[in-house]
C-alpha cells in the first residue's frame, strides 16, 4: 500500500508543470524519494492521452531515451564516505546513528561492487515496461513487419536499455524487423561534445553561483552532529559539505537497485535538508544544461545535431508506406538540453536568480528521472493523403506542450510548423 501511494505521489508530481516550493517541500516530507532528482526511479505515467483529431492515426514514432536505473558510476562515490566514517569509527567519535549509516554504506558498496554505472534489474524492467506501453498505445506504428531502427551510445547500460526494449517489442510482435547498433560513428548526434559550450558550462561563474548558494542555504552542522560525537574532530578531519552531498547521493540511488527492499538512508535527513539538497541539485542541472545566463544561455544547443537528425530521419521515414520506429538510447545530459531546446512545457526559461527556479516550476526531477525519454509520435489521415501530418511529443510518456501554433486538438501540432520553427531556431545558433 505504501509503495502504491508513493507512485501516486510521483504521478501527481510529474503531471504538474508549476509546483510551488511549499507543496514540493510537503511532498518530500511524505515521500523523500522525490528529492532524488535525476536519481529518481522512473515514475509510471498516468496513461492519459488526448484523442487524435478525427481520421488521424499514428504512423511513426521517433524517440530519444536515457538508460534506466543504475548504480552510482564511480567506486569512489561509495568509498569516499565509507572511508570518512571508518576513520571516525576507529577514532571512537561515531554516534550510534553514524555506525548504522556506515553499516548500510558497506552493504551498498557490496551490492554495487564492480557494477559501477551498470544497469540494475529495475532499470531493465523500466525499459521493458516503456516498450510495452509504446506498443499498446500506438499499435498501428508497430504493425506487420515494419522496421525498428535502434541506436545506442557505446556505454553498456545504454546498450542493455536498448536491448531490453527491443526484446519486449519482439515479444509482442515477432515479425518486427530490427536494426540495432552502438558505434562511435554516431556520437556526433547521439552524445555530442562541444568544447565551447563545455567551457561555458564549467566556468567559474557557474561554480561560484553553486558554491555561494550552498553557503547561504545548506547548513551541514545538524547532520554532522547526528553522525559524529566530536565537533572538533569534524572541523579538523571532515569535509562536511562533501560528506553531505555524498550521503545525499547514496540516499537517492538506493531506490534504483534491489537493496531498496532492505534499507533506506532518508531517515538520516530532515525534510528541510532534503529540500535544500534537492534545490542545489536542481540549480546544478539548470546552470549546466538549460538556458542559464551564467553559462552563456545557449547550453540547449548542444543537442542541435540530435534535433536535426530527428527531423531528417522523420522526413525520410514518413515518405515510406510504413515508416516504422526510430529509437535512440543515451543519457540524461542529452535529454535535459534537448527538452529545453524544444522548450517542452515551457522548460526553456532564463533566470539569473536560481532561488526562483522552483517557484517558476523548473524541475530537473520532472525532466530526467532514470529512463527519461522523449517520444515524437506522428499522425496521418489515410483518407486524406494531402492532409497535414501531425506530431505529438511525450516527455516521460506524458503529453507535452510545444511553442507552436495550436491545432484543433491539444498537444497535436502540424509537422510543417514544427520543422519551420525548429530549423529556424537551429539556424540562429552560430558555432
Question: Could you describe each region identified by the protein language model?
Answer:
Residues 1-24:
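Bacterial Sec-dependent N-terminal signal peptides
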Residues 22-147, 153-326, 330-431:
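Signature for phosphate-centric chemistry
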Amino acid at each position: 500500500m505504501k509503495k502504491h501511494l508513493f507512485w501516486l505521489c510521483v504521478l501527481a508530481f510529474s503531471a504538474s508543470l508549476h509546483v510551488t516550493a511549499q507543496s514540493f517541500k510537503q511532498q518530500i516530507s511524505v515521500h523523500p524519494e522525490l528529492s532524488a532528482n535525476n536519481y529518481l526511479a522512473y515514475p509510471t505515467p498516468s496513461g492519459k492521452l488526448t484523442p487524435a483529431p478525427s481520421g488521424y492515426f499514428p504512423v511513426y514514432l521517433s524517440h530519444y531515451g536515457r538508460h534506466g536505473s543504475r548504480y552510482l558510476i564511480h567506486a569512489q562515490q561509495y568509498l569516499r564516505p565509507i572511508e570518512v566514517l571508518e576513520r571516525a569509527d576507529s577514532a571512537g567519535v561515531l554516534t550510534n546513528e553514524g555506525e548504522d549509516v556506515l553499516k548500510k554504506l558497506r552493504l551498498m558498496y557490496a551490492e554495487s561492487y564492480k557494477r559501477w554505472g551498470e544497469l540494475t534489474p529495475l532499470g531493465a524492467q523500466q525499459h521493458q515496461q516503456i516498450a510495452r506501453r509504446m506498443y499498446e498505445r500506438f499499435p498501428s506504428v508497430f504493425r506487420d513487419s515494419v522496421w525498428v531502427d535502434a541506436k545506442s551510445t557505446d556505454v553498456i547500460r545504454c546498450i542493455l536499455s536498448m536491448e531490453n526494449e527491443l526484446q519486449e517489442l519482439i515479444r509482442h510482435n515477432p515479425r518486427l524487423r530490427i536494426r540495432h547498433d552502438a558505434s562511435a560513428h554516431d556520437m556526433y548526434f547521439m552524445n555530442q561534445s562541444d568544447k565551447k559550450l563545455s567551457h561555458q558550462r564549467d566556468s567559474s561563474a557557474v561554480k561560484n553561483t553553486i558554491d555561494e548558494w550552498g553557503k547561504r542555504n545548506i547548513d551541514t552542522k545538524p547532520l554532522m552532529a547526528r553522525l559524529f560525537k566530536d565537533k572538533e574532530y569534524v572541523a579538523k578531519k571532515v569535509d562536511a559539505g562533501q560528506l553531505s552531498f555524498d550521503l545525499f547521493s547514496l540516499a537517492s540511488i538506493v531506490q534504483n537497485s534491489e537493496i531498496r527492499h532492505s534499507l533506506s538512508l532518508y531517515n538520516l535527513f530532515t525534510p528541510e535538508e532534503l529540500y535544500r539538497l534537492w534545490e542545489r541539485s536542481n540549480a546544478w542541472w539548470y546552470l549546466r544544461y538549460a538556458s542559464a545566463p551564467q553559462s552563456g544561455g545557449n547550453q540547449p544547443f548542444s543537442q542541435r545535431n540530435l534535433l536535426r537528425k530527428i527531423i531528417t530521419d522523420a522526413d525520410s521515414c514518413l515518405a515510406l508506406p510504413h515508416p516504422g520506429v526510430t529509437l535512440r538510447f543515451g543519457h540524461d545530459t542529452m535529454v535535459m538540453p534537448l527538452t529545453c531546446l524544444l522548450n517542452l512545457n515551457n522548460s526553456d526559461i532564463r533566470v539569473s536568480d536560481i532561488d526562483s527556479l522552483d517557484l517558476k516550476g523548473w524541475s530537473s526531477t520532472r525532466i530526467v528521472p532514470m529512463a527519461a525519454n522523449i517520444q515524437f509520435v506522428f499522425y496521418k489521415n489515410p483518407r486524406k493523403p494531402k492532409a497535414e501530418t501531425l506530431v505529438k511529443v511525450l516527455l516521460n510518456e506524458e503529453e507535452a506542450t510545444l511553442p507552436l501554433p495550436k491545432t484543433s486538438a491539444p498537444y497535436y501540432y502540424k509537422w510543417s510548423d514544427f520543422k519551420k520553427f525548429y530549423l529556424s531556431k537551429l539556424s540562429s545558433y552560430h558555432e
